[in-house]
Amino acid sequence: MNGRDLVRSWWSVGVAGAARGPRAVRAAWLRRGADATGPGPRARVPGAVREVEPGPGGGVIRFARSELRVLVAVNGAVFWGWDGAGPEPSYALAGACPEPDPRAELEPDTDGGWRVVAERVTVAVSRHGALEVLTPGGVTLRRDLPPRWWEAEDGGPARWMQRSEVPADARFFGPDGPVKGPRPRDGAHRLGNGVTGTGTGTGSAAPVTMPVQLVVADAGTHLLFVDNPWDGTLTLREGAEGAGSGHDRVGTSELRMEGGPVRGWVMAGTPARVLLTWASLAGAPALPPAWAFGHHHVREGAGGEDEVRRVVAAHLERGLPLDAVHLGDGHLDGGRAFTVDQDRFPKLPVLADELRREGVRLVSVVPAAVRAEDRRGEGVFPDLPDARVQYAGQAARGFAGVWHTVDGSVPSGRVDALCLGRAAHEGLRDEVPADERPLVLSPSGWPGSQRYGGVWSGEGDVGWPGLRASLARVVGLGLCGVPFSGPDVVGGGRDGGFELYVRRLQLAAYLPLLRTGAVGPADGGPWEYGAVVLGHARVALGERRRLLPYFVTLAHLARRTGAPMVRPVWWPAPEERELRDCEDAFLLGDALLVAPVLEPGAVRREVRLPRGRWYDTATGRAYEGPAKVLVDAPLERIPVFARAGAVLPVRAEDGGTELEVWAPAPGRSGGGLVVPESGDDGDGPEAERYSVTRSGPRVVVRRETEDGAQEPSRPVRVRGLDGTGGQM
């Protein structure tokens, strides 16, 4: 306690009275302790520009206490790295760093700063290290303030923080943590895959988080990827535009990392252009086998081969399509990965062949950590080169794919999930039948995981809020380059009973991955809820089976263009602000708009339609957008709308593929793409392009080829003419 504090404390006792006096003395003593420890460590900041070293596509800007490397690649992506951080090595990149754009050069800017002008973007760096990304017209997309480092006293990794600003009207999208909609809410979001549950059930997967932001504003769309797998926290705050002559409040994000490099990538353009650039950088998504877009059922428990046969027969006898059975850890020998309990599964390859003839595949669980033999209960991560051999052995047992789980007692990083996915994909691809591709599912991941498989997000949050969160995760993952994902649909009365189960199943029927779990104590299916629920489930799964050719087409397009299969409704028109705030509906491709029921007891719901004509697929009624419409949503179905002029490949009654064409508005035209399943890696089959024109009541469908327009080789069914369907 110094003299000043002593005088202050005695003044408080003598003048302010006895009641406040002791508190003042105590506060002074605490201040004395704080003064003794001294202030906290000061952050290191870059300082002022000292020198510049131009190079291909950009160059290096050296500041007083750091340096910044800026590189514009030939694909339009912009790399930035502080403190000597380069783009490689990186788990996220599909290959080597793209070549620099020879036309982009580092040149002086105003006020002592520097800039790089490229075809699609301009990067400006201030003399103190603030990095600004602008459109070619000079409109700011984002502004990253200079980073700050806190060096560790023991010489360990330095913590760092960076604040960023975006326009007031901008909205953030991406899987940045627990969410209630496709947009992460204001507040702090942990960057790191949490672990919940035991890792053996369908509810054990934690949400996937990636340091990826897709930011949409009037000025344009851009994607930011911070290439740092360390744990951290992202704090978001959306901006607000001032009313009248009031000032705008910019949106902000603050990223705090526990260590690792300060580096990242930015790419700008339309949403489609941004995702195409991102796919060229992080790799094209793996193409799942066609059967992967069907109905998967997770079989847990200790039942053997006869129990698996019973589950398959129970579904097929009740008219419920089934394409795959996922075996949990109950089929493993002692819970050890890459093993089979020979007592309960003595003839597993025979069972797999038998089910394959019925159109059903087997998928095996693989715990992310294998049990250590010498000390029961502990786990170690597998040696990945050897794991490829182990995964190949799974194919020899008859498994068509694998799904990884996370053990709650074992720390698991996001990069580990990527490496395991790669080992599984490379181990299985040469062992599965020549006309098929392997299926690999993981509960967590890192940018680049999409190169090897998809993501299963588990049961997720319970209750009706979990329904909205499940949709948000699928949309967010798609915007981050992971198109194949979906939640698990499980039963049970604890969180809403049969109504919630039906609404979950109806939503999942329009998501890329559809997995169901056991219903009731008997580990049954939807029939456990009675005949009414069984009928609703039969309709939902039947529609999923009918749309399977459309899902296959969307998967091929995702591999070729990076476009997500499930898209936010603003995808074709990001400049429409009202669509940016629509979080209760989504686009499946560019042809269908799906409006799931997310509230209990609802039999009608309001749907916001984008611009253009849309048809209610249940009634055939046409609506003109943009508009809000109130439509029926009985328990047996959810509202689904088709875009006028759309061409959808669907499964015909004979098992072939036919074209479902929704009539354009009079005097308008439309079209669509169809990519048939070929069994290869997705690069081979040629896309079939169709055009649709309407003149009065007549709708004409043509296939566009290099030799000109031709008659379609597939059956065509036109819908939307006076609310009825007809054959062409």
Predicted regions: what is each one?
Residues 91-92, 321-537, 572-574:
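Aromatic- and carboxylate-enriched substrate-binding clefts and catalytic-loop regions
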Residues 1-32, 200, 727-728:
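Actinobacteria-biased recognition of intrinsically disordered, low-complexity terminal regions
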Residues 70, 212, 315, 355, ...:
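A residue-level signal for conserved active-site and pocket-lining positions in enzyme catalytic cores
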Residues 2-12, 62-65, 72, 83, ...:
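Catalytic and substrate-binding clefts that recognize carbohydrates or anionic sugar/phosphate headgroups
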Residues 281-298, 372-380:
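N-terminal small/glycine-rich loop or linker at the start of catalytic domains
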Residues 137, 425-431, 435-439, 445-455, ...:
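Catalytic core of carbohydrate-active enzymes
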Residues 15-56, 69-111:
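A low-complexity, Ser/Thr/Gly/Pro-enriched, surface-exposed linker/loop concept
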Residues 66, 73-75, 83-85, 119-121, ...:
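An acidic- and aromatic-residue-enriched active-site/binding cleft used to recognize and process polar
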